[in-house]
């Protein structure tokens, strides 16, 4: 008969936080490098012999909203925090059940007004300080940021106008319909947006597509699948990572997340579209 495993050693000075689902791995939290180091995250619901009320906090992810209520904890204490955590849009996981009214104490989401921010990405300056996302972002002057010769060379060798890699078709944001209308306008300038992935007849491996965008495309279509406030996903990064300007489409104020808003004088004039066409044909 195998020996009974020892009871886990619980430290009074630590906060124990239970992740209700096994949806996210604990190492995700380690990567956040939180300055508070007395918190212990766990998936072990039996840490207190099944008494969930003993945890200092419980994280519930978006999938909890789809669970029958009998699968959720019943007993809780007034000092215990129930935290709703998600990086998914509210359209995909709406919290419409009356059961969840006054159920959560805190939120941990991509929303800028969340109790705990959980964005898809952060923007740092050259010294490592986080600039965005934030309600009031102080973007540095672009003139103070040097452009390396390597970047200039990559941009000079591009030949295609815009591309898009997409796998989720017929999204709630109607981005497919918007793209169709945009293609109609670009046709008059002999330009087009090349679409790759599950929603197109053109397929390529992810790594091959990334190399192609880096080599060929000036612009990348960063279209979100939902129009939600502050919802900015990694799609913007696909443009930046491939030395392409992301063209954004979503419900967020992108100047709070990833893009410095230019003055109206610096916005592209209609004749510049024609200039891009001529450059492509040279």
Predicted regions and their residues:
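Pol beta-like nucleotidyltransferase catalytic core
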Residues: 1-84, 95-282
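A short, histidine- and acid-enriched strand-loop-helix "catalytic/donor-clamping" loop
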Residues: 87-91
